[in-house]
């Protein structure tokens, strides 16, 4: 199971490289969707099935849809893709090369592997450490946001509201 | 700006800093820093020219990058220690990365490049908020977590800040850039004393905020933003010209004014800890700051440049700007030195 999470993490970074090399937002949006799906897979593979589905629903199903529609309204006639411009292709290949080097370094020496332990029992006991716990952490985390973490929720809602205000204030007509 | 929107944005700016200063959990501290950053953007973009839009964009980019680094430091700390407390970041990777992120937020070298450009691109009032209020939240976090960081990094950054703040301000004629480099230099002084005696960091912050607020308010009242407008200030408000002189001397750290108090106590504390070369270098480099403040004083108060005769007899219109807190601030920023024994109040 940890192999699957590891491969998904690598592909997640490759997806990030895909839009960081700055093609047109049409292709960047596609890369974001791929990365978002893989990120959801990482969360689910590490035991948080509820929060992974929340990522799919809210991030991909809400925000990326709106992003996709706005790009479709503002797109140009010949959008720049990874193969059309040598700068974008070069940036993508450099990022890919860096990722390959990092994986080679990760498996090279005798140092401790940070964050990944191949050979654990993650398939059978999904909560990470040895002992079987009676409380699912992701469900109870989501629930405690509404009970103990009420002020976190209030602040998060307040900041979403203020962010809309700021976005409208910044994009008002400026003469 | 619409008064309702402005009040919402200023409330959230205050709330962000207060949340960071009151928190013991790293996530709420990070949340307060993000609130600060986001609500600073429309304040910086209050005027409608492309220059302030560019300044707001630069501010957003650097602060977002610093927030990202801080988040990575927090998660590394969580991975190695399993807890979110601010005062116990024992992993060196996490604490040094968080240190660098907070130094970027403060604008100390070598992460200082955004400060002069952002301060110059905006009006005087947003620049004032940028250089005074936005220092409170990152410094309150640094005050709590600095014991576990690599102190060599703090000394290096502080010394570099004093050098760059001194040398960078020498060639400037625009007052906002001069005040930005002065801010970088004062951040350097505040950082160096942090491992030795954090109370003096808070003292320096308090006195620096009072001084910077006084100077910005004097400049806002007389509509001066460059050195050439400074030369005409003697005719409009002679009293404020003299006050600008004394406040600038205080900012440079000249006794018997209150700006001398933090510098004196810091050099005292450093020499008590057997470090001689560093306070010597700091004191000498503070003279660079003093040189360009003296240049401002020379052109505003000590000389009257040649001008036509009718410019020497301008009609005095009534001042439409508020000067409500200015007399108090000027008095505090010039005459606080005899109250030095009261710093035990800050402990």
Swiss-Prot record, chain B:
Which topology term describes how it sits in the membrane? Answer: Multi-pass membrane protein
GO molecular function annotation: NADH dehydrogenase (ubiquinone) activity
Residue ranges of the TM segments:
3-23, 59-79, 93-115, 150-170, 178-198, 199-219, 242-262, 274-294, 326-346
Descriptive protein name: NADH-ubiquinone oxidoreductase chain 2
Which gene is transcribed and translated to give this protein? MT-ND2
Function, as annotated: Core subunit of the mitochondrial membrane respiratory chain NADH dehydrogenase (Complex I) which catalyzes electron transfer from NADH through the respiratory chain, using ubiquinone as an electron acceptor. Essential for the catalytic activity and assembly of complex I.
Highest taxon of the source?
Eukaryota
UniProt xrefs under InterPro entries: Complex_I_Subunit_2, NADH_DH_su2_C, NADH_UbQ_OxRdtase_chain2, ND/Mrp_TM
Q: Which GO terms describe its cellular component?
A: mitochondrial inner membrane; respiratory chain complex I
Pfam families in the record: NADH_dehy_S2_C, Proton_antipo_M
Task: List keywords of the entry alphabetically.
Answer: Electron transport, Membrane, Mitochondrion, Mitochondrion inner membrane, NAD, Respiratory chain, Translocase, Transmembrane, Transmembrane helix, Transport, Ubiquinone
> What binding partners and quaternary form does the record give?
Core subunit of respiratory chain NADH dehydrogenase (Complex I) which is composed of 45 different subunits. Interacts with TMEM242.
Q: Name one GO biological process term.
A: mitochondrial electron transport, NADH to ubiquinone
Q: What is its EC number?
A: 7.1.1.2
What's its catalytic activity? a ubiquinone + NADH + 5 H(+)(in) = a ubiquinol + NAD(+) + 4 H(+)(out)
